[in-house]
């Protein structure tokens, strides 16, 4: 059943991006830097960091829905001819009576003239820890990803555009605010999501809640939820608030001891707050071939659902969407998807080249009396059934583990089933991705007849995407699945493909209109 660490990590990234960012900037009210490449900086706006404080150490409590969940820590320091900016967030979250601690942090090192040198990102969930190091050169970025004792190395292009490092963005944004700017538009690179470029807009709204502060409303292209920040005269954020359907996430400036005390509680139970109860039981979903489900947002926002695999949708004249799930239906693989190497690549989460994963894939196929020349559909189903039986410890206690770790532990919930199946498929040369959304359960976490958050797998079979749920014992899929996002899971850090989940979590009502057996 459901895993929430991935989505909570995106919430963490939101805090990291908004409060202290690696940014590009373009602001019509003040000067705009004109450069030829991402390494050059010039002019008064983007110059060296002279005039900035050489040290800053800020701590925040973090709460969700009024419940303290943990802390956020930011540090800026000048170390000789280098500048280091560190951000870290630690949250403890309830999960159906249990609790999980999620920790994400990044450390960016640059030279005093603004040249990026290295960025290290760490993410920990339970006992699972991953680390990614980005080392910058003039033309590319060398990436080393480590998790579960294995390291994968690759190269990636440098992010395009005018590079502003953390020290520069702190100085420049503060300068524009002091100059009286009422709207600042800039571009940021989020270290926690693979140096993804994010467009951001910050608008002055008036006086803040905290004394002698100004409120700024910040929106960004990565996460569909705005954040309010109360900023003091020195440019420091005193309070930030992100409105979410499951409850506002609030960070408040405090002392280190106060921040660390706030993580002592079990945190808000996000599984409980995000489940959707049905007005009447619908157990027929588990055995049917087709279902039509009406989905509405509770706050009136437009809903975004993909048409992929078994799922299609259309507008509901009464509001929201009609979502149709047909177990026998597939969706054609687009030319872009066909050319996308990520669906066959190894990553920290889906390490299809791990010898243990390769061995499991071969064992699964041979135990079904198949081989590499057997039809793709038959091999895909054999792999799905194998994963269902292979993971014998089916619970919520396992952190978001990669396929390599699951191959050893035989433990996990829906996310571990999904990533292990995706890895086995790729080991057999079958392109795959992870699907995320909601699934019907007759009973879960003490509640009956609910839709709860869930992950499964999609595979390319004969030019089409098919849905495969490795948590099911009697069939490969059923129409009680609502798909919200798919992802290649090609990065050990945060995945922007799941950002749509944030605006949907806790913000929908669901009605089963009819079911066809």
Go through each PLM region and give its residues:
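Bacterial N-terminal signal peptides that target proteins for export
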Residues: 1-11
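Bacterial N-terminal signal peptides
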Residues: 9-20
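Sec/Tat signal peptide C-region and signal peptidase I cleavage site
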Residues: 22-24
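Acidic, serine/threonine-rich low-complexity disordered tracts
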Residues: 26-33, 48-140, 144-158, 168-332, ...
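Short Asp/Glu-rich motifs
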Residues: 81, 406, 443-445
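Secondary-structure boundary elements
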Residues: 164, 329-412, 420, 479, ...
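Hydrophobic/aromatic-rich core segments of domains that either
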Residues: 214, 223, 234-236, 417-505
């Amino acid at each position: 059943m459901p895993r929430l660490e991935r989505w909570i990590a995106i919430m963490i990234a939101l805090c990291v991006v908004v409060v202290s960012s690696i940014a590009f900037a373009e602001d019509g009210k003040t000067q705009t830097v004109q450069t030829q490449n991402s390494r050059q900086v010039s002019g008064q706006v983007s110059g060296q960091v002279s005039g900035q404080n050489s040290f800053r150490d800020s701590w925040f409590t973090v709460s969700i829905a009024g419940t303290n969940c943990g802390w956020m820590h930011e540090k800026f320091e000048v170390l000789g001819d280098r500048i280091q900016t560190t951000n870290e967030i630690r949250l403890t979250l309830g999960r159906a009576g249990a609790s999980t601690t999620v920790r994400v942090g990044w450390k960016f090192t640059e030279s005093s003239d603004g040249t990026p040198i290295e960025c290290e990102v760490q993410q920990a969930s339970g006992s699972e820890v991953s680390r990614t190091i980005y080392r910058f050169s003039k033309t590319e970025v060398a990436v080393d990803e480590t998790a579960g004792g294995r390291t994968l190395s690759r190269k990636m292009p440098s992010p395009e555009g005018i590079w502003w490092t953390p020290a520069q963005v702190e100085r420049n944004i503060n300068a524009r605010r002091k100059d009286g700017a009422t709207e600042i538009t800039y571009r940021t690179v989020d270290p926690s999501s693979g140096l993804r470029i994010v467009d951001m807009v910050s608008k002055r709204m008036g006086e803040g809640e905290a004394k002698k502060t100004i409120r700024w409303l910040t929106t960004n292209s990565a996460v569909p939820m705005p954040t309010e920040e109360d900023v003091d005269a020195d440019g420091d954020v005193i309070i930030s608030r992100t409105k979410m359907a499951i409850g506002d996430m609030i960070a408040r400036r405090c002392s280190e001891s106060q921040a660390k005390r706030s993580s002592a509680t079990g945190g808000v139970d996000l599984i409980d707050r995000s489940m959707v109860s049905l007005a009447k039981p619908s157990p027929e979903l588990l055995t049917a071939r087709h279902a039509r489900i009406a989905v509405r947002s509770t706050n009136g926002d437009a809903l975004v659902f993909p048409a992929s695999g078994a799922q299609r949708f259309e507008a509901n004249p009464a509001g929201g969407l009609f979502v149709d799930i047909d177990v026998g239906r597939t969706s054609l693989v687009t030319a872009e998807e066909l050319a996308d190497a990520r669906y066959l690549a190894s990553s920290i989460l889906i390490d299809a080249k791990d010898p243990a994963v390769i061995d499991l894939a071969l064992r699964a196929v041979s135990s079904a009396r198949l081989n590499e020349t057997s039809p793709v559909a038959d091999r895909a189903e054999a792999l799905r059934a194998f994963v269902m039986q292979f993971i014998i410890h089916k619970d919520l206690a396992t952190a978001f583990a990669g396929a390599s770790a699951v191959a050893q532990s035989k433990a996990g919930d829906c996310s571990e089933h999904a990533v292990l199946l995706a890895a086995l498929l790729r080991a057999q040369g079958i392109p795959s991705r992870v699907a995320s959304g909601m699934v019907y359960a007759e009973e879960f976490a003490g509640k009956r007849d609910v839709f709860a958050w869930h992950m499964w797998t999609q595979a390319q079979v004969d030019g089409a995407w098919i849905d495969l749920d490795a948590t099911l014992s009697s069939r490969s899929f059923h129409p009680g699945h609502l798909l919200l996002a798919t992802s290649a899971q090609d990065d050990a850090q945060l995945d922007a493909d799941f950002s749509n989940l944030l605006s949907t979590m806790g913000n929908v009502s669901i009605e089963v209109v009819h079911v066809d057996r």
